[in-house]
Design a protein with these regions (language model features):
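A juxtamembrane structural motif centered on a specific transmembrane helix
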Residues: 1-41, 85-88, 401-417
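Interfacial loop-to-transmembrane-helix boundary motif in multi-pass membrane proteins
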Residues: 40, 95-102, 135-163, 208
C-alpha cells in the first residue's frame, strides 16, 4: 500500500475526532463526546465539593469575603457547567431529590417570614444545590461509577491540601495534637470525615473486586493515618459501623469479605484485651469524664434549644436556615439543627430520606452499587447524631445524593440524549 493510499484512509477532518494523548490516533466522535461529558461531570461534582468545604481561613491571608466568594460562587458555576452538558434541562424522576426539594421549598416558605438576609441567602443556596444535583441525574446509575470516582478525586484533592499544609506549616497543622487543614482551613472533624469516606469507599470497592490489593492498601493506609491523626471519634465510629453494614451485605457472595471479617474480628479482640487502656486514653483526647458524658459540651446547647419557647408555626416549620448554631454555639446534631431550622417538618423529611434510601438499598441485588450506597447512608446516619448537614448544602447531603445515584437504573436513551 502506497503512502498516498494510507493518507486517503485517514479521516478527512479532525472536527469530529479528537486525538488520544500522545498517540495521534483519532477518537471516534461518540467517544470524544463521552470523554467531554465525563470531564464536565467531574468539574461539576468538584465544584459542589468545593462549595460544601466552605471557607474559614487560609495559611496565606485572603479576605473573608473573597474566600467565601470562591466557595459559595462555586455553586452557580456548577449549575452553568451542568447546563453545558444538559442543555435541554432533562431531569430524571427521583424520589430522594423530591424529598430534598421539599426541604428547599419549606425553607423558602419559612424565609417569607421576617428574617435576616443570611436566612434568605442560605435558602437560595439550598435551592441552587438541589437544582445542580437534579441537572446531573441523566448520569446517575452508571455502571462505571462515574460520580463515585469524581467524589473520591475531589476528596483526595482536599486531603492533599491538608498533607501539603503539614509539610509547609507543621506546627499549625498538628499543633493542637489534632490534624487540621491550614493551607485552606479545614477543621479536624471535616478532615476526618473526608478520610473516613475515602477509606470506606476504597475498602468497599476492594470487597467487590473493583480495585487491586496493592492500590487499595496504599489508599486505605494514607486515609487511615490521616483519620487517626485527627483523633475524631464520630468519623471513626461511623466508618466502622458503615463498613460493617456494607460488608455484611456482601459476606455471602464474597469470600474475601468473609476472610477479612474473620481476621478483623480476631485482631479487634486482641487489641481490646492488650491495648484497651491505650485506646481509651487516645480516644478520650485528654478530656474529663464530665466532658465525655455531655459529649464535649454538646448537651449544654441541646437542652436550652429544646426548651426555647416557640409558637405553633415555629414548632412545625422552624426558624429558617441558619449557620447551625444556637445562641452563638454550634448545635452539632443534625436532628436538633433540623428542628431549629425547619421544625418537626424538617426532622420528619430527613428521617424519610434515610429510611427511603435504606429501603431502596434493601431491594437492590447484591453488588458494588448496593454496598457503596449502604456504606454512605449508614455513615451519614451514625454521624448525624453529632454532626449537622441534611437540611442545607453540606458534605453529608452530597453523599446521600451520591448514595441515591447508585440505587437507580442507568438512564435510558431518552435521558442520555
Amino acid at each position: 500500500m502506497t503512502v498516498d493510499q494510507v493518507r486517503s484512509r485517514r479521516p478527512a477532518s479532525t472536527s469530529v475526532a479528537w486525538l488520544r494523548p500522545g498517540r495521534g490516533v483519532p477518537l471516534p466522535e461518540a467517544e470524544a463526546r463521552e470523554r467531554t461529558v465525563r470531564r464536565r461531570v467531574g468539574i461539576v461534582w468538584g465544584l459542589l465539593v468545593l462549595n460544601v468545604v466552605g471557607y474559614t481561613g487560609a495559611l496565606v491571608h485572603i479576605p473573608g469575603a473573597f474566600g467565601k466568594g470562591i466557595t459559595q460562587g462555586a455553586l452557580p458555576v456548577a449549575i452553568l457547567v451542568a447546563l453545558t452538558i444538559n442543555r435541554k434541562i432533562v431531569l430524571r424522576p427521583n424520589v430522594f431529590l423530591c424529598l430534598a426539594f421539599l426541604l428547599a421549598i419549606e425553607a423558602v416558605i419559612t424565609a417569607l417570614e421576617p428574617h435576616s438576609f443570611g436566612t434568605v441567602y442560605r435558602t437560595f443556596r439550598m435551592v441552587e444545590f438541589v437544582a445542580a444535583l437534579w441537572l446531573l441525574t441523566p448520569w446517575w446509575g452508571r455502571s462505571d461509577l462515574l460520580l463515585v470516582r469524581c467524589h473520591l478525586k475531589a476528596l483526595a484533592v482536599v486531603l492533599g491540601s491538608v498533607l501539603l499544609g503539614v509539610l509547609i506549616a507543621p506546627n499549625k497543622a498538628i499543633g493542637t495534637h489534632r490534624l487540621i487543614g491550614v493551607l485552606w482551613a479545614v477543621p479536624a472533624a471535616q478532615v476526618a470525615h473526608y478520610a473516613a469516606v475515602i477509606f470506606g469507599v476504597t475498602a468497599v470497592l476492594w470487597f467487590c473486586g473493583k480495585l487491586p490489593s496493592r492500590v487499595t492498601l496504599m489508599i486505605v493506609s494514607a486515609a487511615g493515618i490521616i483519620l487517626i491523626a485527627t483523633r475524631a471519634r464520630t468519623a471513626l465510629v461511623a466508618m466502622i459501623a458503615a463498613l460493617l453494614v456494607a460488608g455484611l451485605s456482601l459476606i455471602v457472595a464474597r469470600a474475601r469479605v468473609r476472610k477479612l471479617f474473620a481476621i478483623a474480628g480476631a485482631m479487634t479482640a486482641i487489641a481490646v484485651i492488650t491495648l484497651s487502656g491505650f485506646l481509651a486514653s487516645f480516644l478520650a483526647r485528654g478530656q474529663s469524664s464530665s466532658q465525655l458524658t455531655n459529649l464535649t459540651g454538646r448537651t449544654a446547647v441541646w437542652g436550652p434549644l429544646l426548651s426555647f419557647p416557640r409558637d405553633k408555626f415555629q414548632e412545625i416549620f422552624g426558624f429558617g436556615l441558619s449557620n447551625d448554631s444556637f445562641n452563638g454555639l454550634p448545635i452539632d446534631s443534625n436532628w436538633l439543627a433540623s428542628y431549629e431550622a425547619q421544625g418537626l417538618y424538617g426532622v420528619v423529611v430527613c428521617a424519610i430520606m434515610l429510611v427511603f434510601l435504606l429501603a431502596l438499598a434493601y431491594f437492590q441485588p447484591r453488588g458494588v452499587q448496593r454496598a457503596l450506597a449502604l456504606f454512605l447512608v449508614t455513615y451519614c446516619l451514625v454521624a448525624s447524631f453529632t454532626e449537622v448537614g441534611f437540611t442545607g448544602p453540606s458534605p453529608y447531603l452530597l453523599e446521600l445524593a451520591l448514595a441515591a445515584s447508585l440505587l437507580i437504573p442507568p438512564a435510558t436513551a431518552r435521558y442520555r440524549h
